[in-house]
């Protein structure tokens, strides 16, 4: 009996945090420290996630294939020759887009699983480290304040505790309604960097003017341009098509705006109408 009493007193002797836990509690803590290591599979995934260059390079390569296949499908549709089937270009584009989607979903799921596992382990590690630093008896408000990341209320005050929650700064999202066009710069860069024509990758289609080399005028020259499309490389063809459609859209917007200004703001027009 005396030996058991001495062992119990030695286990709960309060000379330091290491003496606050019983033998069973120390065994649980030791097992928890051993479980902090990830499984071999998750360790490989975590090592790959720590160096995302390989995954990003693979996704970028798949995106290049998808962009090139879609652009080739559009070119073959515009420059379709009699008796030429569009099934093969369509099949290539569908396959490239499907591979890009599958790889993106798999990468996201693996990263999500690793994040959850690491989050659980980090939470347990933080809570156990906090418990080791506390006394044998932990107050309820101390535990809740630690888990919620708040300051515990004062213990001597009789008034109900007031928790001041500082709301985080809400970043105001500024949406620019002036430009409704989709940014297709990554799409054009993917086509240009696919080995077709790297010189056209940095040209901005939206900033092209009627005097710039990328501007394509509509009218009789359009038919002449389409007759020679078979000799144009894919990147140049897509760049000219985007410039043509974007410039035509901008011209229509500017024309309608100018007409509205003339009707509403011109004093000569108002004077003639009154006469």
Swiss-Prot record:
What residue spans carry the Acidic residues bias annotation? 32-44
- UniProt lists compositionally biased (Polar residues) regions at 204-221
Modifications made to the protein after synthesis = Ubiquitinated by HUWE1. Promotes HAPSTR1 degradation through polyubiquitination.
Give a short account of what the protein does. Answer: Acts as a central player within a network of stress response pathways promoting cellular adaptability. The E3 ligase HUWE1 assists HAPSTR1 in controlling stress signaling and in turn, HUWE1 feeds back to promote the degradation of HAPSTR1. HAPSTR1 represents a central coordination mechanism for stress response programs. Functions as a negative regulator of TP53/P53 in the cellular response to telomere erosion and probably also DNA damage. May attenuate p53/TP53 activation through the E3 ubiquitin ligase HUWE1.
Q: What is its main location?
A: nucleus
Instruction: Please give the superkingdom of this protein's source.
Output: Eukaryota
Q: Which gene encodes it?
A: Hapstr1
For region Disordered, the annotated ranges are 32-51, 155-181, 204-228, 250-275
Which parts of the sequence carry Phosphoserine? 167, 212
Keyword Nucleus among record annotations? yes
Molecular-function GO terms, alphabetical: ubiquitin protein ligase binding
Q: Into which family does the record put it?
A: Belongs to the HAPSTR1 family.
Q: Which InterPro entries match?
A: HAPR1, HAPSTR1-like
Please give the organism: Mus musculus (Mouse)
Name this polypeptide is given = HUWE1-associated protein modifying stress responses
The places in or outside the cell where this protein is found are: Nucleus; Cytoplasm
- Its GO biological process terms? negative regulation of signal transduction by p53 class mediator; regulation of cellular response to stress
